[in-house]
Amino acid sequence: MSLTNEQIIEAIGQKSVMEIVELIKAMEETFGVTAAAAVAAGPAAGAAAAVEEQTEFNVVLAEAGDKKVNVIKAVRELTGLGLKEAKEKVDTAPQVIAEGLTKEAAEDAKKKLEEAGAKVELK
């Protein structure tokens, strides 16, 4: 049975950010490709170098704050980790919660964690 593009997109849309990151890594390994965007040719010699904007972000839990239970729930939601693993990450902050996210996905993850009471950094 073959899936339509719409079915694939719908299935991906129901996954968490961390599940999508894992899917991308698996696809890169399976097909021997990278998901990195193609790099355009650099400026001509003598031209001023353009400042390159960061495209991949890591979400770092700096501190759990007072609402530790809410932060653990948010970490579980974002990562798909079990209760024990999420609690260990929160208890041993600072910890990287998600790696290689787009700016929008990283800001969404940061917002969820901050709403739960955590202090978060994007790197």
From Swiss-Prot:
One example GO MF annotation: mRNA binding
Pfam families registered for this protein in UniProt: Ribosomal_L12, Ribosomal_L12_N
GO terms under cellular component: cytosolic large ribosomal subunit
The entry's keywords: Ribonucleoprotein, Ribosomal protein
UniProt-listed GO biological process terms: translation
Family: Belongs to the bacterial ribosomal protein bL12 family.
Assembly mode: Homodimer. Part of the ribosomal stalk of the 50S ribosomal subunit. Forms a multimeric L10(L12)X complex, where L10 forms an elongated spine to which 2 to 4 L12 dimers bind in a sequential fashion. Binds GTP-bound translation factors.
Role noted for this protein: Forms part of the ribosomal stalk which helps the ribosome interact with GTP-bound translation factors. Is thus essential for accurate translation.
Protein name per the record: Large ribosomal subunit protein bL12
Lineage of source species: Bacteria, Pseudomonadati, Pseudomonadota, Gammaproteobacteria, Pseudomonadales
